[in-house]
Amino acid sequence: MQINVVKTFLFALAASSVSALAVDTEFRCGAPEPSEELIEASAIMAVAEAEAAANGTLAARQSALTIDTYVHVVATSTSASAGYLSDATIQQQLRVMNEDYAPSGIQFVLKGTDRTVNANWARDSGETAMKTALRKGTYKDLNLYFLSSIPGGILGYCYFPASATTSTVRLDGCTIASGTVPGGSISRFNLGKTAVHEVGHWFGLYHTFQGGCNGQGDLVDDTPAQASASSGCPIGRDSCPNQPGLDPIHNYMDYSDDSCYEEFTPGQNARMSSMFAQFRAGK
């Protein structure tokens, strides 16, 4: 969303209530609210990115990243219908992620896969116990947990970056419904894009509709204002007609159908690099 504001305003925003940037989980994503720490970091980064965009150096803020990735398949049984994903399906999912993140300079390298049959964990009950048992790597490594189902119709959720403490590292990663993988059982959302969306949160991106038409939105300057989440692929939607640009329905951080997703913006690319450098690199 456009954030043509001065530094002093952004720093004031960073100190304001987190509730103004609460993440909408109604449709498909259960990501938690961004913390005050993250909002403050986003505001500071937004200033630097706006200055870089103005002088033509925004692309230089984007870094090439290779992310070690661990996949945990947690299902109610060993049947494919229960979400017990095959190696081939996992490779397809990683291929989608690598294709979609390639313009951002980000690639994911599969370092390990494990499979667990646990009826409670597979329905997203006992998250802390599950992640304590299964999580691998450090805070800079991505852990993906594919579950048979997530309550409330949620397709996935992921934790934003934060200062690396024992608890934040333990819970870190993305939890995703197995039916969203390529060829999965959830129609409209079975091209593997839910993982792309959720990993965007892992890199510190908010939803494009954050804050609606009049708030400060996702604190990324080149994502147009958006009143609410998209559904389907509503070409030409303009939910904030008094703000520049049409709704970013093709952006991975909206709620469009998988077939509608196409891009991250240059500002989002720079933000992901900045967030990784501040919160995850070397952790």
UniProtKB/Swiss-Prot annotation:
Keywords assigned by UniProt, alphabetized: Disulfide bond, Glycoprotein, Hydrolase, Metal-binding, Metalloprotease, Protease, Secreted, Signal, Zinc
Pfam families recorded: Peptidase_M43
Stored Gene3D superfamilies: Collagenase (Catalytic Domain)
GO biological process, one term: proteolysis
Active site: 198
Main location: secreted
Record has Hydrolase as a keyword: yes
The protein's Enzyme Commission number: 3.4.24.-
Localization, UniProt: Secreted
GO cellular component: extracellular region
Enzyme category, top tier: hydrolase
Record's signal peptide: 1-22
Keyword Disulfide bond included in the entry's annotation: yes
Binding-site residues for Zn(2+), renumbered to this chain: 197, 201
Glycosylation sites recorded in the entry for this protein: 55
Disulfide bonds: 233-260
Molecular functions per Gene Ontology: metal ion binding; metallopeptidase activity
Entry-linked InterPro entries: MetalloPept_cat_dom_sf (IPR024079), Peptidase_M43 (IPR008754)
Annotated transmembrane regions: none
Family as reported in the entry's similarity comment: Belongs to the peptidase M43B family.
Chain's role: Secreted metalloproteinase that allows assimilation of proteinaceous substrates.
Protein name: Extracellular metalloprotease MGG_08041
Annotated organism of origin: Pyricularia oryzae (strain 70-15 / ATCC MYA-4617 / FGSC 8958)
